[in-house]
Amino acid sequence: MPTTGPPPPLPGDRPLPSSFDNDEDFYNENGFQKIARKLKQEPLVPLGCVLTVAAFTGAYRAMRAGDHGRVNRMFRYRIAAQGFTILAMVAGGIYYSDDRHKEREMWKAKRDADEEEKRLKWIKELEARDEEDKLAKEIMDKRRQRAAAAAAKREGRAVEDKAAEGGAAAAQDAKSSSGLSWASAPGWFGGNKNEPDANAQTNTGDAEKPSEK
């Protein structure tokens, strides 16, 4: 993650000034750059390592050649080179102790800042997911409400249609029964005026038959 400067100090912790405060590359360097910076700060340490390796190589070659005097001399050089390397490391550690302590503090602060940023991003992502879930739930609830309203409307229409059909059937039945009642009334209201005379003639005929016998 690129940064433009040192991370902000933690609350209640005011760091001491350091030579790295204005060095932006210090916070953006990789492993190779860090090693190069260490070599530039303490050049005597790699020099002592090179001298130690050279003395050990010379002792090995003298041993292969059978020159015991040179072997002893090279081993003494190796011991001296190792002592020089250790001394350079100790002196560099003492000289750069404050900067190293500051470097560790800055590294811890940067690590804490990165962890805090990751935590905030994680919280924001959870909040965004929560909002998405709430929005999806609201949309589903609205869809269910619309579906329920549409179903209720369809049921209401079906009930109204059934009621209208029942009313029409009742009106048709009432009309049919009214027509039958008017048709069964005698006289001018729709009945047959000759029916009583026919009944009377039938009765008269029946009465005249015994007298003929």
From Swiss-Prot:
Cytochrome c oxidase subunit which plays a role in assembly of respiratory supercomplexes. Residues 16-107 form the HIG1 domain. GO terms for cellular component: mitochondrial membrane. It is a multi-pass membrane protein. Residues 165-175 have a biased composition (Low complexity). This is Respiratory supercomplex factor 1, mitochondrial. The chain crosses the membrane at residues 44-63, 75-97. It comes from Pyricularia oryzae (strain 70-15 / ATCC MYA-4617 / FGSC 8958) (Rice blast fungus). The gene is RCF1. Gene3D superfamilies: 6.10.140.1320. Residues 100-149 form a coiled coil. Residues 1-14 have a biased composition (Pro residues). Residues 1-23, 142-213 are annotated as: Disordered. PROSITE patterns: HIG1. It holds the Pfam family HIG_1_N. The keyword Lipoprotein does not apply. Belongs to the RCF1 family. Associates with the respiratory chain complex III/complex IV supercomplex. One of its GO terms (biological process) is mitochondrial respirasome assembly. Its main location: mitochondrion. Keywords: Coiled coil, Membrane, Mitochondrion, Transmembrane, Transmembrane helix. Residues 152-164 have a biased composition (Basic and acidic residues). It is found in: Mitochondrion membrane. InterPro entries: Hypoxia_induced_domain, RCF1.
